[in-house]
């Protein structure tokens, strides 16, 4: 639809948060990927939101049961003051675990399990912002290098969660 390939790429990037690939954001962007039909489908599915949240909560409880026993895998604390939607299940991979977050991600991918690195790279490391902020952010850097979000959705089977946790526990 565009005769100018460079402009087409820029428009695509801007409508997808400026994301070029899993670890590089080239320019500021927004989330503009939904068309009218997709918006309609979203509206029609709103009646299922609470059911999905409840299903995800049960899956998170199962993850927490297994992962709480693994040294070097830190879980975010539960808080009764926060109502969660369980959209993500982040873990923090510490040095005590014996491998880095990146090594663990590769290991899971070898088993066809695709976790996501969240908060990575730091915004200050994005190509479009690099060099604009001069302060030190050690807490943000620590989290950016260690957070991994494990697969979570209401329909994930318990056996799949158990397999993921077994892979994390075995460290092979």
Indicate where each model-derived feature is located.
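PLP-dependent aminotransferase class I/II
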Residues: 3-172
């Amino acid at each position: 639809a565009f005769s100018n390939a460079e402009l087409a790429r820029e428009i695509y990037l801007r409508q997808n948060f400026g994301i070029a690939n899993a670890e590089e954001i080239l320019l500021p962007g927004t989330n503009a990927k939904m068309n009218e039909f997709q918006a309609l489908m979203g509206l029609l599915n709103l009646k299922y939101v609470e059911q999905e949240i409840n299903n995800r909560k049960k899956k998170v409880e199962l993850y927490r049961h297994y992962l709480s026993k693994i040294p070097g895998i830190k879980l975010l604390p539960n808080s009764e003051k926060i109502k969660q939607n369980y959209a993500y299940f982040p873990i923090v991979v510490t040095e005590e675990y014996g491998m880095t977050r990146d090594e663990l991600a590769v290991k899971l991918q070898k088993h066809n399990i695709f976790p996501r690195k969240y908060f990575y790279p730091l915004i200050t490391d994005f190509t479009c912002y690099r060099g604009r902020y001069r302060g030190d952010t050690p807490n943000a850097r620590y989290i950016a290098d260690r957070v991994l979000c494990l697969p979570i959705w209401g329909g994930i089977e318990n056996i799949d969660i158990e397999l993921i946790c077994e892979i994390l526990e075995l460290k092979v």
